[in-house]
Amino acid sequence: MESQQLSQHSPISHGSACASVTSKEVHTNQDPLDVSASKTEECEKASTKANSQQTTTPASSAVPENPHHASPQPASVPPPQNGPYPQQCMMTQNQANPSGWSFYGHPSMIPYTPYQMSPMYFPPGPQSQFPQYPSSVGTPLSTPSPESGNTFTDSSSADSDMTSTKKYVRPPPMLTSPNDFPNWVKTYIKFLQNSNLGGIIPTVNGKPVRQITDDELTFLYNTFQIFAPSQFLPTWVKDILSVDYTDIMKILSKSIEKMQSDTQEANDIVTLANLQYNGSTPADAFETKVTNIIDRLNNNGIHINNKVACQLIMRGLSGEYKFLRYTRHRHLNMTVAELFLDIHAIYEEQQGSRNSKPNYRRNPSDEKNDSRSYTNTTKPKVIARNPQKTNNSKSKTARAHNVSTSNNSPSTDNDSISKSTTEPIQLNNKHDLHLRPETY
């Protein structure tokens, strides 16, 4: 009777019990799970047969559903409310969150080969700009990333801690050409910043603000793979991925360096076009500045020949250097080195003439001392000249008076005698005497 019951309850579908035994028909000392080996083999064969039938038979309403086996169902995505973009083009809060990717666990467990895109990631058609997102891939990037550690906060608590809530994050466009990669990577970096992942982006020195977590690296790899197909990547990006296909951080770092290089190129071109030199700075410094700019541009693929460089340099010359624009402008084969030889010659001549000129500039204190000493030395000379000038300015009558008085004095000198003979002598001849020359 026991065998009949076992045959009647033999398994007919996957997941059903192999034997059905009631407690009344089993001895008290017998284990209810104890089944003979032959019966066990029959159960296994029946189970294998049921599985083969289930895989080969297409799904229909006639096939009974197994209540003991629940296949994983994708999480339902709420439709966007008042969103400017269609639902298949948006990344909602239940998408793109690294913390929701529990089935990946680690970047090494990513179920995709390097840059082999699954058909589910291709755009639905040429009319759609962005690919459709499956509901099982990604959760929203609007949740803030932790500053440190590898644990992520719950979405409910993360929403309360957000400073600026963005329910929908617009994904970057698809890369369609290697030449568009510099512009595309800018939009991709902006996409990461809007997703609160700006801390993992390399800075100017090439290092991120914080360390990237495994879940964030997984998200970074998958989003880069989705929007940047391998056939449209530049050669230098493919070289990096050939070494490590998950090293997206190195690609971002190199891209930022190239952006800075492009900015430096633009600044160098503007500086070279607006050169000014009048000899106020050393000629060596001016030459070093110009040659460094030309070398950087040539190394970055912007070739500046000697003719263009000389024209730009001579256009900025002024002062005594201005005549170089007219004396050498017809020399088509002139090089930058020859032009700087002329600039150095003029600069050295200027410096030599400045050094040879005497310097008459004095301190104000020295000028005050010199003025005081000059007045002291000239004062006695003025005093010495004044008496002489007054003596010489005496009238002739006064001098004649002195001479007459000196003649009356008993002591006379030769000067007074010679002067007295010139004057007439009047004699009073009271006795009418006539003197004869012979008598005396």
From Swiss-Prot:
Its gene? Answer: TY1A-DR4
Name of this chain's protein: Transposon Ty1-DR4 Gag polyprotein
Q: What else is known?
A: Retrotransposons are mobile genetic entities that are able to replicate via an RNA intermediate and a reverse transcription step. In contrast to retroviruses, retrotransposons are non-infectious, lack an envelope and remain intracellular. Ty1 retrotransposons belong to the copia elements (pseudoviridae).
Predominantly, its location class is: cytoplasm
Where are the compositionally biased (Polar residues) regions? 1-23, 48-60, 127-152, 419-428
Q: Which GO terms describe its cellular component?
A: cytoplasm
Which keywords belong to this entry? Answer: Cytoplasm, Phosphoprotein, RNA-binding, Transposable element
Q: What do we know about how this protein assembles, alone or with others?
A: Homotrimer.
Compositional bias (Low complexity) spans? 153-165, 402-418
Functional description taken from the UniProt entry: Capsid protein (CA) is the structural component of the virus-like particle (VLP), forming the shell that encapsulates the retrotransposons dimeric RNA genome. The particles are assembled from trimer-clustered units and there are holes in the capsid shells that allow for the diffusion of macromolecules. CA also has nucleocapsid-like chaperone activity, promoting primer tRNA(i)-Met annealing to the multipartite primer-binding site (PBS), dimerization of Ty1 RNA and initiation of reverse transcription.
Q: Where is this region: Disordered?
A: 1-93, 126-174, 352-440
Which residues are modified to Phosphoserine?
416
- Feature type site, description Cleavage: 401-402
Residues passing through the membrane, by range? none
Q: What induces it?
A: Ty1-DR4 is a highly expressed element. Induced under amino acid starvation conditions by GCN4.
Q: Name one GO molecular function term.
A: RNA binding
**Which species is this UniProt entry from?**
Saccharomyces cerevisiae (strain ATCC 204508 / S288c)
Biased amino acid composition, Basic and acidic residues: 429-440
Provide the residue span(s) of the region labelled RNA-binding.
299-401
The compartments listed are: Cytoplasm
Swiss-Prot/TrEMBL GO biological process terms: viral translational frameshifting
